[in-house]
Amino acid sequence: WDYINSVSDAMAWDQFFINPNIESIGMTYGYMKNYEDRVRRAVNTPDSKGNYALWQGGMEPNIPVGSTEGVSASMEKALAGAERELKEGASGKWVAHWKMVHIVRPVWEKSGKANQMGRSFEKLSYTQEDADGLIHLDSAPRTIRGARNLLSVGLQYGNAFGQGMQAAALKPADFFGNDNVLYLMEDMATGEIRLSILW
């Protein structure tokens, strides 16, 4: 996820590199998909002694409090994300809210394996196509509301951090009062990523 910040900073000089609305940048989006693929292949490549690292999946930021429809839709999305990560080779996942444990843990329990260390993956390659994939922008919406959302959550996190909180439950101000849009747990990466995308 933090790769959004890295690639946005690295490409800040390029006037044609404009990220879409942050809601579109999931782990299956353009450069994120290619980045994750390289990570999983690198992590699952043994060292000179045959030892493997453990690839842990991403963080599930949903806080399951809201309308029935909103919670249901978010849980379906979280479950699909966990199942995708298991398929891709992750050995687990971490959650921002304890209520999410019973949603994602069964995904790995039903696999019947303690982890996926040593799973065979295609070896890393270092081609121009690989490099281009790490900055690839898929077609996705770029709207004023998207910019407002970036700014809104970034300012909210700055306020929370200034009060001594390292993490906070946030959502864009445009959705205050809309219980179909859940709060997400945000941390310092939120400020870095959102500011990087904005500039």
Which residues make up each language-model segment?
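Conserved alpha/beta-domain cores
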Residues: 1-199
